[in-house]
Amino acid sequence: VAGAEGEAVSAIKIAAELIKNFEGCRLKAYPDPGSGGDPWTIGWGATGPGIRRGVVWTQAQADGRLATDLVGYEAGVVKALGGAPATDSQRGALISMAYNIGTGALASSTLIKKHKAGDYAGAAAEFARWNK
C-alpha cells in the first residue's frame, strides 16, 4: 500500500504540472467562454458549488483546491484502468485528462481502451482528439 501511495503522489505531481502548464491560474472567477455564464471557473480550472461571479481566491486556495481535486481524479483513473499497468507519467497524463473531461468520459474513451489493450502509442495519439 505504501508503494502504491508513493506512486499515486508522483502521478498526481505530474498531473498538476501538466494542468498548470495548460490551464493557467486565474484568481478571480470567470464565466465559461462557450456559454458566457455557467459553469463559472476559478484557480487552475476549478468549477462547482460556490464558484460564481465576484468570487476571488488566493493562490494558496487555488493550489489547495487543485491538490484536493486531483486525489479524486487519481482514484477515478485507477478505477478506469481496472488493474492495467501504467507508469507514473502515463497515470499523470490520464489524471490530467480526467480533470478536463471527467472520469466517466475517460472510463468510456477509446484512449483508455487502447491503453488497457497495451496499445500505448494508440492511446497517446487519442489525446489530440480531445484538443478543442
Region annotations inferred by a language model:
Residues 1-132:
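Cell-wall polysaccharide-cleaving catalytic domain and substrate-binding groove, primarily
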